[in-house]
Every structure is written in structure tokens, then in C-alpha cells.
Amino acid sequence: MDRASELLFYVNGRKVIEKNVDPETMLLPYLRKKLRLTGTKYGCGGGGCGACTVMISRYNPITNRIRHHPANACLIPICSLYGTAVTTVEGIGSTHTRIHPVQERIAKCHGTQCGFCTPGMVMSIYTLLRNHPEPTLDQLTDALGGNLCRCTGYRPIIDACKTFCETSGCCQSKENGVCCLDQRINGLPEFEEGSKTSPKLFAEEEFLPLDPTQELIFPPELMIMAEKQPQRTRVFGSERMMWFSPVTLKELLEFKFKYPQAPVIMGNTSVGPQMKFKGVFHPVIISPDRIEELSVVNHTHNGLTLGAGLSLAQVKDILADVVQKLPGEKTQTYHALLKHLGTLAGSQIRNMASLGGHIISRHPDSDLNPILAVGNCTLNLLSKEGKRQIPLNEQFLSKCPNADLKPQEILVSVNIPYSRKLEFVSAFRQAQRQENALAIVNSGMRVFFGEGHGIIRELSISYGGVGPATICAKNSCQKLIGRHWNEEMLDTACRLVLEEVSLSGSAPGGRVEFKRTLIISFLFKFYLEVSQILKKMDPIRYPSLADKHESALEDLHSKHHCSTLKYQHMGPKQHPEDPIGHPIMHLSGVKHATGEAIYCDDMPLVDQELFLTFVTSSRAHAKIVSIDLSEALSMPGVVDVITAEHLSDVNSFCFFTEAEEFLATDKVFCVGQLVCAVLADSEVQAKRAAKQVKIVYQDLEPLILTIKEAIQHNSFFEPERKLEYGNVDEAFKVVDQILEGEIHMGGQEHFYMETQSMLVVPKGEDQEMDVYVSTQFPKYIQDIVASTLKLPANKVMCHVKRVGGAFGGKAFKTGVIAAVTAFAANKHGRAVRCVLERGEDMLITGGRHPYLGKYKAGFMNDGRILALDMEHYSNAGNSLDESLLVIEMGLLKMDNAYKFPNLRCRGWACRTNLPSNTAFRGFGFPQAGLITESCIMEVAAKCGLSPEKVRMINMYKEIDQTPYKQEINAKNLIQCWRECMAVSSYSLRKAAVEKFNAENYWKKKGLAMVPLKYPVGLGSRAAGQAAALVHIYLDGSVLVTHGGIEMGQGVHTKMIQVVSRELGMPISNVHLRGTSTETVPNANVSGGSVVADLNGLAVKDACQTLLKRLEPIISKNPKGTWKDWAQTAFDESISLSAVGYFRGYESDINWEKGEGHPFEYFVYGAACSEVEIDCLTGDHKNIRTDIVMDVGCSINPAIDIGQIEGAFIQGMGLYTIEELNYSPQGVLHTRGPDQYKIPAICDTPTEFHISLLPPSENSNTLYSSKGLGESGVFLGCSVFFAIHDAVSAARRERGLHGPLSLNSPLTPEKIRMACEDKFTKMIPRDEPGSCVPWNVPI
């Protein structure tokens, strides 16, 4: 046994040898910090986002095969990599050598925006292609199931994937026996001149071919080592931990005997997150990944024996092969396992996690254990004392001592028996998201009839997610033995199971009534499945299912993704080299795909750099009694702990009307408030020390978390805002009907893929400070840092190359973090880096404001709304931040597309004990618009009219005035509405939906269409000014810089297009380095959909200034080149640099009068969405979405369509699955992708069609273009209202005809519980106040 083992592996074809390996080191930081391969990104640290995906390759000398699989680098201990080859995004291609076809296609198909997730996407696709050079679309979408993107909406990524399929342009799903390529494009009609309809925005014939022979080979040295080098046990150790990797089963047993408490890990997908997130520490780790006996696959006459070391992906492949070869009656359990293996985690985790690890971990929401438990599986155990076999039953799953592994035992293999004739096994699960999400409830069920006539001989039912362990309803099953399989038995079974599988009202995870309902809904599904099989086997003996029940057995509508894009086509008069209006690729797209794009934390380490990490409050409202820093300061590598006392008189900064503390002084007002900051030599040391800071609190009253609690305590920020138009009170006197209602809307986490990141570097002279930061607002960072350091702003320079997503979340809270980081750097004269972990980021930074909307509407029987009185309440959190502006924008935009002749709307920002909420894409409109649309829905229901008819009746239709007296021309609004009606075939599909609903009791479809009027502008001229700087060099090349931030919206690409048009030179001649307060001072925040508008006009101004100077030179030498002209200008002492400036639009709003001109123009649009829901589980699927948008004249249709799609998917997440959970004490439960679910590739519409209106004049803007970044978020509510329509259909069929009020997000829980039926009535209900709930609806 080597006591000081060397670690040898390969990275991108290069040998790596490490002599002093720390077993706690994961591959991700090793790649990024040690090898400087920064293309692999940190996104969450827990394997939930896919940003750190790499390919791991291993050679098996026994099979003589190389296995490639994707893996999450954040979870891979480098000690486990001996003898492997690691391939990162840098290893498959680069701009310096040759880019790989995967990299090229994802870039040219416009599959990148901010680009932070792109390397992970690339590596997932690449790994699949190494194993399957011509994959199916199913394989590709499955490969991307573990990768998240917050920007694109996934459609262009899917398009890039399709190019590798054998039939790349086809959706691979024939309708009426005809390929989609042989039909008209998804039934879309041809449109007028000026538009082009296409399924794609790229030229596939330009792509590099995929050539498997050109891939990086597996290192021959590793093959020789595996075949010829004697295998030895390897030992790696540090001061804190030892890592043992035995080579034989005997050695493994010896280690386990010596270290009985040491965990045995294969993929580190369970132990790793526990150590990282839950503070669990193991001084000894045993890794048996080379032991052959743990990878056994034996076929016996009784069933399969699978080695505990097999990965879940390998188990899936083995079972898929078995079910193809064996008769169905033998493979019931295998089919059930395959069903859950298809959705369990993502491809990376399935390839890392082992079968044995999944079983032994015994997570209460395990997807496989309930199936294995009912399948009579047994576990083969081994220790130095000998072999033992135990059943995988409830006693084992609940860790009963007499049924568990002994500390010195290991799990060698699992026996999974064949099913028998007349034995049926099924599996069920429901999660917040369809794939890569832990189950809320899951279940395995088995019944055996023997040779009886439908009489139950054996019955097993197990549930996960409903207790601290998997629960088996053993007593219920025993009481049902001997019963006939009929509805009477079902009713008894439901009652018995509900009694046995009881859930406390305060059960962890919440959703208690939903879980109780799922328990018996799954049982009902199982009953129907078995009944249908029995009927098919013996139609005479067994009765047919009632027609209405058949739909319960069908999966939700699902086909392969397909899309069409209708975009503007440039006219014949435009110069062929003019790039404006062309779908030009994001100019950083290839760098995103190769990993060469540099983000803040990708910057190299600075000499003597320190790392800063924050200590945050664990109480929501408390007095700080004491802070003990002694233990933290005594730890190795710790340099300092910064407190409010150090900051003293610079411990606050005034954002708008009130100052906010950086670090808490004597009180805390939310969980997650910054208390102090630890400085250490490394990130690891800083984080360990932060855990040792001891803070004593004394709780204070009141604790206010919700809007209703704020109203009760009169806890508001000043001032109240009010908008009034017409005479509301008089109008209420003349209407036919009046209704009152309210809707609550939850918040939303920004979930930008790149967390808050910065590096502050003291320059060493004149007190200068460079701040490299991921922010939307460099000027603000400059101001707050300068103020904190008591320096003039000219000593602080803020630099932003690019931002890995922001959505409003990287402005003001980023400034607080930067101020403390800069203070630390200034105090110690050393560079300081601060990068928040995902959980810290979600805890500290706040997000979209939760809203409560109350409305009173007066309307006529024909649907005309004559009076509307509204109240808007936002949950601002503990400080004002931008909450007042959010309320103001919500009020100004609440009318959406409708003319309300008499309107009164008031808004309040509620002060609560939550982290301060802030700006978020849409800035109040997604909330305010939903309130208005909910009112429209209720008016329609009262009038007996369709919501779409009521929408059209009340819509702006011509030149009119908004409630704040700004003129509006609604021509394009009506055109969007009518075209959306046409392209979506709304009337035909509405009839089809009604027909479907009439024929299906347990599945329902819904169809909804919403209009959009989105005002664009910042409310004041000062906020809309912009500047740019353009240099022409003597070789004729151009450098441009401007005040806008590139955060995925493509503003830099558009600015280069502007320079190209104005100066008449190719795009390749123009370069843009980034944004800096050094080159463009005093730039406003990048947001509000106006970044390209404002900065583009400044760039245009600078270019025109240069052209005017150079006009005499160019006219004398019209055939010259830019190099010639630049040299001549230099020789004649003509400046080749110009500053461009735009003053901003004339904007204002007088809140006292409630009138003004706050916006420059309006974006119009419409969206139609169709969904299908499962009434028994609350699951839903977005079948199709059609969006029509007015974009004026698009500067770049590829970028604009990307913004529309990305915003829509983000909005869809907001209104459906994204749910923040807080404890009654104000602690955020949802702190990462495991708990908080943003849309994944499985959530995108099966059909996604985008249409841009033909070009239209928008005279005051850049080339008549319109900003689109924010408006599309609201269109996601078309999915919300389609679900509402489906739920309403279900309720009507069940005799429930009253008003339906559904809050947002419309999660599976809310959908299921709104579809009331006999099962929802059967469950026990907790009396209000009888228990303390796990979570509080914020």
C-alpha cells in the first residue's frame, strides 16, 4: 500500500501528476485555480445546474472498452480521478486552434446569450456525441436534462442539437403520417412582404462536419497502466482527511473494519453535498471504484443481480436491454425502475451516482427505493465476518438497527427479482419540475393475484417524500389481502392508507394536503392501470374501465420540440454589407462555447490576493448581543474579520431616500443580513473561519414576513403612490355589475448563472483602486466604493468585461458587497476577491417583489369595464432599495393593453423582515399585469363571455391616452392580437380543446391568449443619457466603448453593427473591449430594455462626428481604404477619436397630478399558449406557444427573438414553477437548484413559434428599433391562464361553477388542489392554528 500515493491523470491530453493531494479538493476548483482552465464554471456547487460539466473517460482492461460520461466537476474529488482522462471545454477546441462542431453550432445557432452556462451545455452534447455520433433527439434532450440556462429559453440550443441528428431539420414526430418538413411550416400562413418565415436563423450548410476520427484520443499511457501496471491500494491524505482507494474486495473489507464509520463513496453525489452544505465532516473516506465485484451483472433464474458500484446510468442501460429481451410479465419491476431512472437527476448525476449509494443513502425522497422495496429486492452484504443477505424493506429504509448494515459491512450487490405472471408493478412521482427535480411524493406499488380471479394475494405500497424515510403501508396492504380488485377495494384502500401514512401539518417540505392527495391519487392510478391490464387479459371476467377514467392512464401530451420563426427581411434598397437587420451571431458566441470568454472570477489570481466571505444573520429581527471573533481569527490563513465597528462612519450609503447599512451594527432585520466579513488567504480558509464566528441574538418583536402582516402592523415605506383617471366613484353607480377580488403573487429568484463576483485591486499609488465586478451599474459601484474609502471618484475605476446574467439583480446589492470588499482591500493593501456561493447569493440579494393585488371592477353585461379601483402591495423586504420605483412602474403599466375610462390605483411598498427585494426584469409589470388580467378573467366569467372577447372589447384600438395622459397609438397592438389569433389558429384549437375536455375526465387542456402593451423608458431624461467613445487607429481598425453592460442581451454585438453601418466598414474591423468608468464616465444602469437604444444613439453620434471630420479626406480619395484615410487624417492632425453623446428622451411624471410623459414608446405583442394538465397530480405540459411581437425595425432579429423567448420562459417559470419558501422564522429554504426550480429543457413548449411584425417606424429610436429585453416576461402568464382554463374545465365537469381564484405561481400543488374531486375531499384537514407550518406563503 502506497502511503504517499501520487495522483496521475490526464486533462485535455496532458499528464497531471500531484504529489500532495488534499482529499477535500474537488475537480472544479482544481481546474480553475491550479490548471487555470476557467471554461468550466461554478454555478451551484451541488451538481444541480450543469455549468461545471466535463467529460470523464475511463479504460476498462477487462472489456477493453473506453467509457466516456459527463460529470459535474463540482462534486468530483480529484483523488477519484487516478488513471482517468478529463476533458474540459478547452480541450475540444479553441479559437487559437480549431473550434469543435459542437462549439460552432451552439454559437451560430444563437444558443448563447450571457454564455455562462454554455461550456457545460457544450460538454454535455460533446460527451453524448462521443458515445453516439448520430444521436436521436430524445438522446440529446436527455443529455441536456442536467443543464440549466436562464437566458435563452432553450429553443436555439435545441436547434443546435438537432443539427447532429440524422434528420436534423425534422421534429422526428410525424403527424398524419407526414414529416413536418413536407408540410407547410407548422401550418403558419405566409405573411406580407417584409417578413420571412423559417424554422431557423442560421445556415446549416456552413457548419463544420462532425468527424469522430479527429477527437482527442484516450491517452495510451493510461491504457498501458491499466493493463500492465500492478494495481495497488492508493492513499491520499491531508491534515484533516484520509482517502483510501483499495483495489481488492478483501482490502475494502479491511478498511471498513478499521474505519467502520467511514463512508464508502463512488460518485460523491450524496456525501459531497452533505459535507458542503450541511457541515458534515468525515475524516476518512473509502473509495472502492476499482473493485470488480461491485460492478457485477448476473442473470439468474430468479432475476437480476446488479453490483452496488454500477452507476445509475449503467443500471438504466442494463434494464433497458433486459426489458427488450424478456417477456413483459417478468420485467414489471424493471419497467417501473426505468420510468423513474429517466427523470432522476440529470445525465451527469446518473453517470456519477451508484446504485448502492442511492440505496444506502436512504433519502426520504429516493425515487428508486420505493420500487425496490415493493419489488421484494434483497441486499447482499459482506464484511470480514462473512456474507449476509437482508431484505430491502421498511425496516431497512427506516434504519432499524436489526435490519440495517452493520458499521463494518458493505453492500456488494442488489437482487432484483423477476415479476411473475399476474404480478404488476408501477411507479409514480410528482415533482415541482418534470425532470431533474426531487419528488414531492413518489411511490412504488405491486400487486400479485396468483391464479385467483382478481383476488389480491400480495400487495405492497411504498411512498417517498412523506416522512423521514420511505414509508411502506404494510398494515393497509395486509388488510386488503383476499379482497377483489374493484372500486370497493379502492375506497377501502384509500381510507386505510391515509390512516397509516399520516402526515403532520408541520411536516418538513410543507405541501401537506397536496402530499396527502397524491398518496391516494397515485393509488387510484395504480388501480386503473392494473384494471386495464386485467381487462385486456380477460375481457369477459373483468369489467371495462369507465370511459372517463381512461385518460388517467395516459401520459401528458409530449412530442419532440419544433419551432418556427417569422422575422423581418431586409429590403432590396439596403446595402448588402450593411449588417443592420441581419441575424448576426452574438460576437462572443464562439468564445462562450470554447470557454475563452472571461468572467470576473476567471481573472488570474493577483499576488497576495485575499478572499472575503460574509457572515450573515440567522435571525429575522433581533438585537445583536455579542459577536465573538476569537475562534475565527485564530484559524490558519485568516487575516482579519471586518465588522461595522471597522467601517464606522462609512458603514452606510444612501440609495434613494434612505441610507442602508453595509454591516449590521446593533440590530438585524432579516435572515441573510450582512454582519461581518472574514478575510483569509484562500476561499476554503475564509469559509471555514466564517462558520466559527459566534453571534448571540435577542429576538425582537414584531416579526413581519408577509404582506398581510405588514398591512396589519401598518408597516410601509413612504410615500404611497396613487394614479387616478376619470371619476371612479361615479362610474360605479352606472355599471351593470360590480365584483371584488384579489390575487397573490410570489417572488422570484434572479438565478443568474454567474453569482455575485468581484475582485478589488489596490494600485499601490495615489490611493487608486481597480474594481473588476459583475454588475449592471459600474458608475454606482464607483460611487459607493469611493464614498466608503473617502476618495474622489477619479481614484476608483470600475471595469466590466461581461456579466453572466443579471436581470436586475446586479446593481444595488452588488454595491454593498463591493463597498465592504473594497474597504478590506484598502485596509490591508492587498487585492481581495469575493464570489458568493449560490446559497449565499440567494439568501442575501433578494429578488422579484411578491405582490398582493386587490381589485374592484364595475362593468357592463357586454364585458365593458367602466370602473376599476385597485390596490397594489409589494413585499419590499427590510430596506427600500428600488421598491418605490417598482411600485411606480407597476402603477404606470397596470392598464396593460386596456382602456379603462375610470381608474384608481394605489400602491404601497411593505416593510418586512425579509432580505430587501430589488429590480427584476419587467420591474413591477409582471405583477401588475397579472392582477389586471385576473380581473379581466373574473369579469369574463361573470358575463358568461370568453376572456379573449372581454380582452378585445376593452383593448386600446386607436390613438388614445393612457391613465397618465400620454398619447398612445394602438395600431400595432391590434395587429399583434389579430395576427396571433391567426397564426395560432385560435378558434380551431379552442374547439379542439373543448372536444378533448369533453372526452377526458382526468386530463384537461386549456388555451389562453393575452395581449401586451409594454411602455419603454426610464421616467426621466437624466436616467436616459448615454455616452460612447470611438477610436480609429492608423491601420483602419476601430475600437468602440460605451456605457452599456453586456449581460447576455447582445448590446455589444448591436453596437458593433451600428459602427459598421455608420462607418461603412465590415464588422470584423470593429472591436469592443468592455465597459469601464475610465473610458465612459457617469453611465446609467443597464436595464429597462433601453441599453441598446441609448448607447446605440451615442455610438451613432460618435461615428457621425468622425465621418464629418473625415468627409473631405474620403471625398478626395473615395476608393481608398480606412487605413489610407486614417493615415491621411493623422498626417493632417485631424483627431481620430470622438465622444458620442445622447441626452436622453424627454421624460417626466408628476405624481401629484398623476400625469406626464414617462415613456418614449410602447412595445406591443400577444401570446397564445395551450397546456395539458393531469388533474390527479397537478402536473402540466406546455403544448404550444405562439408569440407575435412588434419590434419596430429589428437591428438583429436573432438577438431580438432570443430576448423574446428567454423572457417568455423566465416569465413562464415565474407564473408556474418558481416558488420561494420561507420558514415561519424568516429563513429561506430554497437556496439552490435542488430546492428552487427554474424552467429546464423539459419545460419548454413542445411547439414554439415566434413572429415579428413587419418593420414599422419608431422615429425617435435607433433605426426605428425597440427594446425587447423585459416585455416578454409578462407573456409567460399566457401559460398561467391556459392552466386556469384547464382547471376551470375540470371544475365545471365536477359541478363546481363558482368563481375560481388561483394565485401565482401556479404550481402542481395549486393545480391539483383546485381540481377538487373525491380524493381531495377524502384527505384529513388540519385545523387552522393547530400546528406550526414548515413554510409561510410570502
Curated annotation (Swiss-Prot):
It holds the Pfam family MoCoBD_1. GO terms for molecular function: 2 iron, 2 sulfur cluster binding; aldehyde oxidase activity; FAD binding; iron ion binding; molybdopterin cofactor binding; NAD binding. Mo-molybdopterin binds at residues 113, 151, 806-807, 1047, 1088-1091, 1203, 1268. FAD binds at residues 264-271, 345, 354, 358, 367, 411. GO terms for biological process: lipid metabolic process. Its EC number is 1.2.3.1, 1.17.3.-. It is an enzyme of class 1 (oxidoreductase). Residues 5-92 form the 2Fe-2S ferredoxin-type domain. Binds 2 [2Fe-2S] clusters per subunit. Its main location: cytoplasm. The active site is at 1270 (proton acceptor). It catalyses: an aldehyde + O2 + H2O = a carboxylate + H2O2 + H(+); retinal + O2 + H2O = retinoate + H2O2 + H(+). Residues 236-421 form the FAD-binding PCMH-type domain. Homodimer. NCBIfam families: mam_aldehyde_ox. AOX genes evolved from a xanthine oxidoreductase ancestral precursor via a series of gene duplication and suppression/deletion events. Different animal species contain a different complement of AOX genes encoding an equivalent number of AOX isoenzymes. In mammals, the two extremes are represented by certain rodents such as mice and rats, which are endowed with 4 AOX genes, and by humans, whose genome is characterized by a single active gene. Belongs to the xanthine dehydrogenase family. This is Aldehyde oxidase 1. The lineage of its organism: Eukaryota, Metazoa, Chordata, Craniata, Vertebrata.
